[in-house]
Amino acid sequence: MPAAKGGASLQPVASGVFHSVVHPTNGTATIYQAEDGSRVLRFTNFRTTNGPNVHVYMVAADDANDNSTVRRAGFIDLGPIKGNVGDQNYTFGPELDLSKYRAVSLWCKRFSLNFGTAPLAAEHAMSAN
């Protein structure tokens, strides 16, 4: 688990497994939250195809199995992907409504393609299963 600024611990609030859409994609996406409300989206055991101008989107949908869902549902851009292989973190604030934005998509802006998506489930819902 990543540590917050100042060494404070982060608690997992949502997690999901990537599935491929137009390119092979796998790994886990987990959102951690600090006491101050700041959040970290962490990819672990992550791998996708290398591509031009790929960004990390939080999508306002339960899942995004195609390209049109991302465009139709709406999204928040967390910035360019840090690499196509390996663990990585993306920080964002408490203003992003996780009850609305329930999927992580890897979006190629150049070709308008969804490389892969991780539908997120609340951590308490996951542990209840």
Predicted regions, residues:
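C-terminal end-helix/capping segment
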Residues: 115-129
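N-terminal post-signal-peptidase region of extra-cytosolic proteins
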Residues: 26-29, 39-44, 63, 88-90
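Short, exposed beta-strand-loop hairpins at the edges of beta-sheets
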Residues: 93-117
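Solvent-exposed coil/turn segments that connect beta secondary-structure elements
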Residues: 34, 44-46, 59-62, 83, ...
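Beta-strand signatures of extracellular beta-sandwich domains
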Residues: 55-57
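Transition segment at domain starts
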Residues: 1-36, 70-73, 125-129
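Extracytoplasmic
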Residues: 24-26, 38, 51, 99
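An anionic, turn-rich surface loop/hairpin at beta-sheet edges
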Residues: 66-93
